[in-house]
Amino acid sequence: YGVQLLMRGYRDSPAETYNVRQPEVVATLQREYVACGVDLLSTNTFNSNPRKLKTLGFGEDFERFNRAGVRIAKEAARDKARVFGNMSATGEFVFPLGGYTFDEAVETFRRQAAILYEEGVEGFLLETFSDIKELKAAIMAVRKVTADLPLIVNMTFEADGRSITGTSAESYAVSIQDLDVDVIGINCTLAPAQSLRVFERLARVCQKPLCIQPNAGTPIYDGHRLSYDLSSESFAFYADDFIELGASIIGGCCGTGPEHIRLMRRALDQRRSPRAIDKDPKRYLSSRTVLTPIQPFLSIGERINPA
């Protein structure tokens, strides 16, 4: 929501300040998305983990921003869409890439997840993570709060198919799919055409349902106004491509306004079933940055030599 609010002239940062200062601004935008036919509506709590808010100077508003974010979204959804609690990165890297520990990361996200859960979200959307270790901490945090609600996770990648911390799309899928998550995907950074190439690499090795949420092209700022260079018609054009690669959940990230989503929904309504993409049959071992194929189990018999 932050980019959409910025494009509409609301320049306060973080965007979560509007949850308490001008809640109707957030509610109006969310109602527009609901009117376009979204199935899932995320809360305006992207930056609202306590560590990020403290860095931005809003540490004391942590609880208010999160509680208000859920209440506004639930009012906007009005049983027409399911409300998912939106959580994202702290802006720091977990040790050894950064200065805070894995346990600190888990506790940071647990505090946010607990409030979103108390306010009645119907699931969680973890998105725009570039450090897979921090994403794992967020997953653990959510599952400390609830073992039952659906959990969607998205990492963000550069055009070469790696995150800025060096994790490939394949390593991401192999590392995350055995955790207690329901949907694995990618979001942000890339336009649809670039996202497709990365998404296909993910889809080939991932055994979980898939999600894709690209940007509406490239941002353009003329000194007065922010816009993105991909029209809503061009954005919706990629619906078939996403489905062909097996996407079960399709949305948008930066620059995708209600009109982008309306046209995407119309395109999806004409073809609702994701394709069963051919999967890579190999098994893999993966670290944060290295993916290694392994051979299937091989049984070796040994002749018994009785004494």
Regions found by a protein language model. Give the residues of each.
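Domain-level signal for soluble alpha/beta catalytic cores
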Residues: 1-307
